[in-house]
Amino acid sequence: MIFDEFSIKTLIRPVPDFPRPGVIFRDITPLFQSPKALRMVADSFIQRYVEADFTHIGALDARGFLVGSILAYELNKPLVLFRKQGKLPADVLSQAYCTEYGEAHLEIHADSLCEGDSVLLFDDLIATGGTLLAAAQLVRRMRASIHEAAAIIDLPELGGSQKLQDIGIPTFTLTAFELSDR
């Protein structure tokens, strides 16, 4: 299926003043209500990574799980879950990161990766990059490497993609929005 950025962008619902005044939240749930759009999104990532050399897909809590699990299945790769604090039942590694609301923690099971593994990180959106940067730190603490950080949406004005690229992590997104886009 051919990727149609316009079709995808029209299905990403802008929600003004959520979760706080002045923010335009980019709601991807309408993408999942359209089988055609979901297939277009998934197929675009699958085609990009079908011959790529990495060992695991790391999906970020929670919306990164939605497409990350499809990619893991289609590409026959193990899926590693990066969860919010307190959601994983076994031994974990934890990494603090800053959000626009304060500090949060991202966790991964301590036995999820081994030295030499290579991870494709996946989230729904790259904004400030805080969550993906925390995931990257966890991957590196486990002596694994990051193949790329991928997402459906980039908000380049918030600088997250640039922060990732500045520490040597390539990024790939299907579309981008300016903060003022409605």
Swiss-Prot record:
- Please name one Pfam family that this protein belongs to: Pribosyltran
Q: Which InterPro entries match?
A: Ade_phspho_trans (IPR005764), PRibTrfase_dom (IPR000836), PRTase-like (IPR029057), UPRTase/APRTase (IPR050054)
Q: Does the keyword DNA repair apply?
A: no
Molecular function as annotated in GO: adenine binding; adenine phosphoribosyltransferase activity; AMP binding
Write out the annotated subcellular location.
Cytoplasm
* Keyword Transferase assigned: yes
What keyword terms does UniProt attach to this protein? Answer: Cytoplasm, Glycosyltransferase, Purine salvage, Transferase
Pathway listed for it is: Purine metabolism; AMP biosynthesis via salvage pathway; AMP from adenine: step 1/1
Q: Which GO terms describe its biological process?
A: adenine salvage; AMP salvage; purine ribonucleoside salvage
Q: What is its EC number?
A: 2.4.2.7
**Catalyses which reaction(s):** AMP + diphosphate = 5-phospho-alpha-D-ribose 1-diphosphate + adenine
Q: Name one GO cellular component term.
A: cytoplasm
UniProt lists the family membership as follows: Belongs to the purine/pyrimidine phosphoribosyltransferase family.
Q: How does it assemble?
A: Homodimer.
* Record HAMAP family: Aden_phosphoribosyltr
The free-text function statement in the UniProt record for this protein reads: Catalyzes a salvage reaction resulting in the formation of AMP, that is energically less costly than de novo synthesis.
Protein name as it appears in the record: Adenine phosphoribosyltransferase
Q: What is the lineage of its organism?
A: Bacteria, Pseudomonadati, Pseudomonadota, Gammaproteobacteria, Pseudomonadales
